[in-house]
C-alpha cells in the first residue's frame, strides 16, 4: 500500500498515535503541524507543541511540515466568535475550527498537494463513508464538534483512534515509544489552549455594566455585559441580595436590548414542546419530517428526544434542554450522526 495520508499532528497523544497506526498499516504518512493565530497577551504554546510533533515524526521516520494557517484561523474562528458574542450569542469555536481550518483550509491544502491523498486527525469519531458514527469510546466521542463535515469531505477523512478506547491509545503511545505518551490532553479553545474566553473577548468587546434580575424582575446584582454570559452559567456575575442558604444562581435568560440577565436557583427548564430553529444546517442523511431522533445542544450534554418539524427546525420532547443561540444542535439516529445546525 502506498496511499498518502496527511495527518494533522498537534503534538498531542491522539494525533501522534493516529500517525503511528497509519504508518504501521503501510500508509505513506506525512505529519503536518498547523500553526494558527495566538493572541499576544497569552503564553506562546505552539512552539512547544510543534516540537513534540516533530519528535514524534522523527521517531516514526515520516516527513514533517509546518503549515501556516494563522489568517484562516483568525478570520474563520476568532473573528467569527467575537462577532457572535457581540450579537449576544454563544458560538462554539471548536465547531468552527473543524469547519474552517482542519477540514476547510487544511483539507483544501492537502488536495492541492495530491488529489488522491487522505486527511487524518486524532478525533474520537468514526464514519461509514457518508455519515459520522459515534466513536467506540463514547465518553470521548467528538462527533458533536464534527457535524459540519459534508458527504464530499468524509470519504477522504480518517479517524484512526475512533475505534479505540482512550486508555488503549495511551498504551499504544508507549508501545510506539512516543514521547507524548503521558502528555495531558489539551483543554480550552481549539488550538489556542487554556486561555479564558472572557479574557480574550474583553480585548475586543467593551464591558457594559448591567443589572442581574431574579425571576420576579427584582434587581439582585450586577454583571459586566450580557454578551459575556451564556444560558446555564453560574459564575462571573455579582449577587448583592443573597438568600439565606446562599444557593447558586443560574442564568436563565438574557435581554440584550436592555443589558439585563435573569437568574434563577433552578437551572431546570420546561423545554418540552419547544421548537428549535436552526441555521447553517448540514445533513449527511436527509432528516424525515415527523421522525423522532436524539440530539444534544452542547458538548457532553445528555441526549434528548426531538422530532423533526422541518429540515431546519426540531421539536424538543423532554424538559431540561437549554437552547443557547449560537451553539450547535447535533442530531443522531442511533449511533449515526446525521448532521446538525446552529441554534438561532
Language-model segment annotations:
Residues 1-147, 158, 167-168, 174, ...:
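ATP-dependent adenylation/nucleotidyltransferase module used to activate substrates
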Residues 120-126, 132-344:
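AMP-forming adenylation/ATP pyrophosphatase catalytic core
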Amino acid at each position: 500500500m502506498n496511499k498518502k495520508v496527511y495527518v494533522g499532528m498537534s503534538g498531542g497523544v491522539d494525533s501522534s498515535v493516529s500517525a503511528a497506526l497509519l504508518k504501521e498499516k503501510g500508509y505513506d504518512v506525512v505529519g503536518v503541524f498547523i500553526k494558527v493565530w495566538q493572541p499576544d497577551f497569552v503564553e506562546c504554546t505552539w512552539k512547544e507543541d510543534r516540537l513534540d510533533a516533530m519528535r514524534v515524526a522523527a521517531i516514526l521516520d515520516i516527513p514533517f511540515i509546518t503549515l501556516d494557517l494563522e489568517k484562516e484561523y483568525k478570520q474563520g474562528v476568532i473573528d467569527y466568535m467575537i462577532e457572535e458574542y457581540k450579537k449576544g450569542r454563544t458560538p462554539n469555536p471548536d465547531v468552527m475550527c473543524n469547519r474552517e481550518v482542519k477540514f476547510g483550509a487544511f483539507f483544501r491544502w492537502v488536495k492541492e498537494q495530491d488529489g488522491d491523498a487522505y486527511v487524518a486527525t486524532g478525533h474520537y469519531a468514526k464514519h461509514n463513508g457518508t455519515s459520522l458514527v459515534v466513536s467506540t469510546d463514547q465518553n470521548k466521542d467528538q462527533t458533536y464538534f464534527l457535524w459540519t463535515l459534508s458527504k464530499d469531505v468524509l470519504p477522504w477523512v480518517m479517524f484512526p483512534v475512533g475505534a479505540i478506547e482512550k486508555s488503549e491509545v495511551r498504551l499504544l503511545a508507549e508501545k510506539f515509544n512516543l514521547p507524548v505518551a503521558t502528555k495531558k490532553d489539551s483543554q480550552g479553545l481549539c488550538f489556542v489552549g487554556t486561555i479564558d474566553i472572557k479574557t480574550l473577548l474583553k480585548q475586543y468587546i467593551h464591558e457594559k455594566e448591567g443589572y442581574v434580575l431574579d425571576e420576579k424582575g427584582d434587581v439582585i446584582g450586577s454583571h459586566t455585559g450580557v454578551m459575556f454570559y451564556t444560558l446555564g452559567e453560574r459564575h462571573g456575575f455579582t449577587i448583592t441580595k443573597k438568600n439565606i442558604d446562599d444557593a447558586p444562581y443560574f442564568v436563565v435568560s438574557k435581554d440584550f436590548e436592555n443589558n439585563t440577565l435573569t437568574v434563577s436557583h433552578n437551572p431546570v427548564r420546561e423545554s418540552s414542546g419547544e421548537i428549535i430553529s436552526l441555521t447553517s444546517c448540514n445533513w449527511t442523511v436527509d432528516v424525515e419530517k415527523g421522525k423522532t431522533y436524539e440530539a444534544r445542544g452542547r458538548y457532553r450534554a445528555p441526549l434528548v428526544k426531538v422530532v423533526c418539524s422541518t429540515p431546519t427546525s426540531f421539536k424538543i420532547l423532554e424538559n431540561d434542554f437549554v437552547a443557547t443561540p449560537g451553539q450547535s444542535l447535533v442530531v443522531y439516529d442511533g449511533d449515526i450522526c446525521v448532521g446538525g445546525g446552529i441554534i438561532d
